Amino acid sequence: MDNKYITLLQRIIQTPSISGQEDAVCTLLEQWMSVEGIAVRRAGNNLWAECGDGPETVLLNAHIDTVKPSASYTRDPFGGECDGTTIYGLGANDDGGSVIAMLAVFVGLYQKPIPGKRIILTLTAEEENSGRQGIEMLLPEIGKIDYAIVGEPTSLEMAVAERGLMVLDGEAKGKAGHAAREEGVNALYIALDDIQTLRNYEFDKVSPFLGKVKMTTTMIQAGTQHNVVPDTCKFVVDIRSNGLYSNKEIHALLQPLVQSTLTPRSTRLNATSTPIETAIVQRAKALGIPLYGSPTLSNMALLSCPKVKFGPGDSARSHTADEYIHIDEIEQAITLYKQLLQ
């Protein structure tokens, strides 16, 4: 891999790009691509470019935003240090490795396109916060896509399925009263009963790649002082769907089971899967790339075409202190991306 890509990844890390604040890193990449002679377009803090022509359109996507740095960092999260084999810093693994690998492949294809294929590279914002100013801004411009590769740290295994996400805000209503007397209706107890009901609920349908729907209560809040029976209790439920139920179906199943009101923050991030017989998956199998179902959400959820998730790095490093990626992981990804696109 040319040293210019290592330097670019260091510069990306050194340019803070927390979700919703990607302007500077987007400008950095836009200018870099222009210097490389690529005709790049920008919408908001999203970039896209294309090369080649033909009946088949392939989308490459990686995201340029990051989460906020963990307080546990021992290195400078924006340092972009390189020791010769490893690059450290926020976003190195998620998703800088995929950005660099896809860029390197695209630069080569821009100079020598694959006959019969139109390749579109998209570098997009607001993936980490599931915002609406990311890849969704570009899709109407791009048009029909035959298949997509979403670059994420997958240990160079291919995710052919991905869990969806729905967050429910639960609210139990009771009646305030004095805690010293037998009065009032305790909203906290109502919420606890409902949380137990949700905890015990079993979804019947099991996905071969994703397993059962996973449902976890993650937050609860009630009461204002020790001697008042709380009249309201709020809680949050994180639901990871498995593709056999839509988020709307899950909500419709759960609401009648509880007294609390369950309000979805959004139902748009459904689970996704791509049939094994799809050409890109068959190509991966022929190359010996392992297939799996991913528990984590990505831009796959926002694409309606056949899509897979594949890239350098390890998902277990994402959102952790002292994030890093090995240079040879990026180099392997470049080789495999090229082989997948042939």
Regions found by a protein language model. Give the residues of each.
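Hydrophobic/aromatic beta-strand patches that form the interior of the parallel beta-sheet core
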Residues: 58-60, 122, 149, 308-310
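Buried hydrophobic packing segments
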Residues: 29, 99-109, 138, 191-194, ...
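N-terminal helical capping/dimerization or prosegment-like subdomains
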Residues: 1-69, 232-236, 250-253, 327-341
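Acidic/histidine-rich catalytic neighborhood of metal-dependent amide-processing enzymes
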Residues: 95-167, 171
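Active-site metal-coordination/substrate-binding segment of hydrolases
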Residues: 57-120
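A generic beta-sheet turn/junction motif
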Residues: 42-44, 51-53, 163, 174, ...
